Amino acid sequence: MLYSFHPYLKYFALLGLVPWSESCAQSKFVQKVYSAILIILNAVHFGISIYFPQSAELFLSLMVNVIVFVARIVCVTVIILQVMVHYDDYFRFCREMKYLGLRLQCELKIHVGRLKWQSYAKILALGIGFLVTVLPSIYVALSGSLLYFWSSLLSILIIRMQFVLVLLNVELLGHHVSLLGIRLQNVLECHLMGANCTLDGNANRLCSLEFLLALKQSHMQLHYLFTHFNDLFGWSILGTYVVLFSDSTVNIYWTQQVLVEVYEYKYLYATFSVFVPSFFNILVFCRCGEFCQRQSVLIGSYLRNLSCHPSIGRETSYKDLLMEFILQVEQNVLAINAEGFMSTDNSLLMSILAAKVTYLIVLMQFSSV
């Protein structure tokens, strides 16, 4: 399915986020040079901004904004470098997702289809929203002054579009996990109904040892796909979370400063255009990661319920394979993680919100000194 999107996704290559072409060696070389230019351009912007510091009378605190600005530059460098290093791995990931879809269709008779329209609407709305919300900051930067805004505009666009790309991949992974879970639920229902099972018109096939083995192999391939995704995007996800957290926290603080009339109200346009998209980024991505983990837990629960069925105990080979499958699901959790530093789920969302409150309290105490 990801292959079918590439004619559209390849335009993300203009920001250095995806490879432009799979087979053309010249295109690969040109894009690597282009990506290197993007990295150098960000570094030059950083050097110029630090070497020629702006007036201390401007809206934002110099120290805080340098920290956020550096975080953006580092994050963009990590994102682009990861794409350069994993140029061929990206298309390998696309092929693996395609092969998994074919296996689900051929061996498990699952209609893979496309994502739900709600997923497309969510991704498109977020993508358009991320671009539109840059406009208020541009307006404030033109009419007043925003420290380091113009130097970090390219970084903002790259980070936001990278999030859209990663979100699309996570939605596709979650789609395949849910399909596998539904098929396991069908197997469980067929065992429970016995001879009365009418699913697919063939109860013997759903309850067979070969079908369970195909399910087990599909789950293992799906876990490998998750692992490959984490290798491809792990560092960029980690960097993006750091930027989103720092951006949203600092801009919520400056919003509070504007509301208590420390600064002019026109700066609300800029602060809202940063922390609102950042918060939605964190919320949506954590929810998508949570969905994948819940589907993985559901798969485990279906298998454990199946192991309790009386007919399973009479078939030694089927029971042994089922026990192996249960252990495989427990040990190989289908989760989105950033190089082992964190798993993307609701617990991460709660930790981020708690950390935001803590840092906001600290910032407000410093501002009152």
From Swiss-Prot:
Probable gustatory receptor which mediates acceptance or avoidance behavior, depending on its substrates. Has also atypical sensory function in organ not limited to conventional taste sensing like abdominal ganglions. GO terms for cellular component: axon; dendrite; membrane; neuronal cell body; plasma membrane. It is a multi-pass membrane protein. One of its GO terms (biological process) is signal transduction. The chain crosses the membrane at residues 33-53, 60-80, 123-143, 148-168, 225-245, 266-286, 349-368. InterPro entries: 7TM_chemorcpt (IPR013604). Belongs to the insect chemoreceptor superfamily. Gustatory receptor (GR) family. Gr2a subfamily. One of its GO terms (molecular function) is ligand-gated monoatomic ion channel activity. Keywords: Cell membrane, Membrane, Receptor, Transducer, Transmembrane, Transmembrane helix. It is found in: Cell membrane. The keyword Transmembrane helix applies. Residues 54-59, 144-147, 246-265, 369 are extracellular. This is Putative gustatory receptor 39b. Residues 1-32, 81-122, 169-224, 287-348 are cytoplasmic. It comes from Drosophila melanogaster. Expressed in the adult labellar chemosensory neurons and in abdominal ganglions. In larvae, is expressed in neurons of the dorsal and posterior pharyngeal sense organs. Coiled coil: none annotated.
